[in-house]
Structure formats: structure tokens, C-alpha cells
């Protein structure tokens, strides 16, 4: 009898641990802030991954070219006044990457022909940022559908991997501490 209780406790302990940890994780018993501070992931993943190759009109005309091993830091400009902060932080993050500066490409997308002049004027302040016209505006709709914030209002920085998949975006913040956390994320990704 004593051996059966001992055997049952040995066999049931791992099952009990797995069930308890699963419940703990799924019901979110711990504070979300505590979890976010102890992780390297400070961005928000898109609801589903989507590839930028789907936006190509044909094989000769592509929306964006992906170079080997280069990640893309991008912003979709719908309002130039809102995008200034994201462009500024994109440049600062790129410079802060130090030796990995050449592994990241900065891109700005826009689709509204009415703001084209304002966007060109704005990008003169941010050299080495490629400007891409999303002529039919499909990209902003896909970004909006796959994010938890209003991409038209916020104009956040988002990350595209070297294979053309949109991975995550960073919610806009004026807090320098948040951008230090974003820099840590980028260093892990790159």
C-alpha cells in the first residue's frame, strides 16, 4: 500500500505541474506588466503573418526589394505630422544598432497622392529612408486588419524580416525607456 501511494505521487506530480502551469498561463494570473518587463518582446506581433510578395503586381514590378539578411524597419505614413515621431525614432534606433546598422533598412510607405509633397519634404530630414508608394493602398488595409491599433491614426514602426514577412509593430510612445526596450528587441531579432 505504501509503495502504491509513493508510485502514484511520482507519476501524478508532472501531470499536476503541467496542468497548474497551463492554467496559470492561460488565465493570466500574473500581472501583464511584470511579464512584459521580464521579456525581450516589447513589440506587438501582428495577428497573422503576411508576406509582402502578395502585394507585387507582377514579377517585374515589386512593391519592395528584400536584400539578403536585411531586416526592414518601416512606417506607413498616413499623416505626416503623426509620422514624424516614428521616423525620428527609426533613425535613432538604426544609429543605436551600432555595428548592425547595415543589417537594417529604413522604409516609409504612403498611398495618398495628396500628401506626397509633404512626405517628400519630411523625408529630406531623414536621409537613407526609402520611400515607397503603395499605389492601390492594399498594404495599409492589410496592416490595419492584422494589428490591434489604428494604423491610420498612429503610424507606428513595424518590422519586416529578410524574407518579406511582417513580424511585429511597436506602439508609438514618447517615453525614451520604451525605445530602449525596442532597441533590445531589435538586437535580439538581428
Role assignments for model-derived ranges:
Residues 62-90:
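Short active-site neighborhood of thiol/selenol oxidoreductases, capturing the structured segment around
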Residues 1-53:
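N-terminal targeting signals for export/organelle localization
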Residues 118-154:
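Short, internal strand/loop/helix patches
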Residues 155, 159-190:
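Thiol-/selenol-based redox modules, centered on thioredoxin-like
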Residues 47-67:
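A glycine-rich, hydrophobic loop/mini-helix early in the fold
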Amino acid at each position: 500500500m505504501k509503495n502504491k501511494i509513493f508510485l502514484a505521487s511520482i507519476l501524478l506530480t508532472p501531470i499536476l505541474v503541467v496542468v497548474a502551469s497551463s492554467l496559470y498561463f492561460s488565465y493570466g494570473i500574473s500581472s501583464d506588466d511584470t511579464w512584459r518587463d521580464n521579456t525581450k518582446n516589447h513589440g506587438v506581433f501582428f495577428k497573422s503573418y503576411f508576406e509582402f510578395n502578395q502585394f507585387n503586381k507582377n514579377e517585374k514590378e515589386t512593391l519592395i526589394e528584400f536584400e539578403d539578411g536585411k531586416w526592414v524597419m518601416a512606417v506607413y505614413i498616413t499623416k505626416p505630422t503623426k509620422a514624424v515621431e516614428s521616423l525620428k525614432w527609426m533613425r535613432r534606433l538604426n544609429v543605436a544598432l551600432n555595428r548592425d546598422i547595415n543589417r537594417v533598412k529604413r522604409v516609409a510607405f504612403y498611398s495618398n497622392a495628396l500628401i506626397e509633397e509633404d512626405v517628400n519634404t519630411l523625408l529630406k530630414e531623414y536621409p537613407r529612408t526609402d520611400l515607397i508608394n503603395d499605389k492601390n493602398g492594399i498594404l495599409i488595409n492589410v496592416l490595419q486588419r492584422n494589428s490591434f491599433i489604428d494604423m491610420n491614426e498612429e503610424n507606428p514602426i513595424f518590422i519586416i524580416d529578410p524574407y518579406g514577412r511582417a513580424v511585429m509593430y511597436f506602439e508609438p510612445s514618447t517615453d525614451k525607456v520604451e525605445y530602449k526596450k525596442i532597441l533590445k528587441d531589435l538586437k535580439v531579432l538581428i
